[in-house]
Amino acid sequence: MKKVLIAMVFLLTAAVSIAADKKSGTIVMEFDLSAHPENGEAKLWVPYPVSDADQLISNIRIEGDYAESAVYTDREHSTPMLFARWNEGAESRRLSFSFDVERDEVLVRDLQGGEKAWNRNDFAPWLEPTRLGPTDGVVKALADDIVEGRTTVLGKARAVYDWTVENMFRDPDTRGCGPGDVCALLQTRGGKCGDIHSVYVALARSAGVPAREVFGIRQGRKDGQDLTGWQHCWAEFYLPGTGWIPVDPGDVRKMMLREKLELDDEKTAEYRAYFWGGIDPYRVKLSTGRDLILNPPQQGDPVNYLMYPFAQIGGETLDWLDPEGFSYRITYRQ
């Protein structure tokens, strides 16, 4: 399995060598909104990582010519975000945000089917539908079919994982990480990590399994590497008596595409086993939560997720999937 992990991380990040249990570095995010029209306030929200059991965030540095800046959370998901504002007419609108990260490999193995009693009400936020991830209709019908005969949270979560690996595929033409429109995806079956894990989460929730997406970015392998398009998300389900368990069927399908693997190949089985309860350390968790009302609130609809920077100038939203037009860059430092 160690050789499998090394091969997996090499292909995901083109790393020459790895430490299988930890990965550290510095992430630098640079924004320059100066070229956009000056007719209105400029507001910028950036996902703000925090330390947890699997990652240590330190040495945070925020610099810029903004009129105000602060770190807030939203009210529903407690998603941290860095907010900055520039006054109308400001000719220069720049911000630099960097932090050091030390990330652990997560391996939750020997999962058991016996589960402690749990109260669904305690996990209501992770059982509810989202705007693009319903838990009724065709999604519920499919989930019921997938978990038929399974009576435990673990059994249902595994059945949904297996179905997702076997029936979804990675579509490299998808823009960004994908919007995660579950009903559309059940028709096309193709997308990137945001799509594949939205399907997993919606099906798991429909089957009564608490689940959530985790939005982040991959770490690089060498100093100065451009990470601007390296956003990645994965999923977690809650196993009573154990806690949140990571799964990444999206990376299984990514490896299958890169290595031209079929479902019945031995390497596919190895990746499939690794990403059930395991994730590599070459990533940083940035946020969770869908359908966000930012803080301060943005104008318009809820934000689908906060994995990319979000900005509005005079109330008009910039395209966060166009880094050049938006004008931001993310760099890895060692």
Each language-model region and where it sits:
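Conserved structured core elements
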Residues: 154, 158, 190-194, 198, ...
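Hydrophobic/aromatic-rich core segments of domains that either
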Residues: 198-298
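Short hairpin/turn module used for nucleic-acid contact or packing/dimerization
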Residues: 280-334
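Intrinsically disordered, low-complexity N-terminal segments that are enriched in acidic
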Residues: 19-107
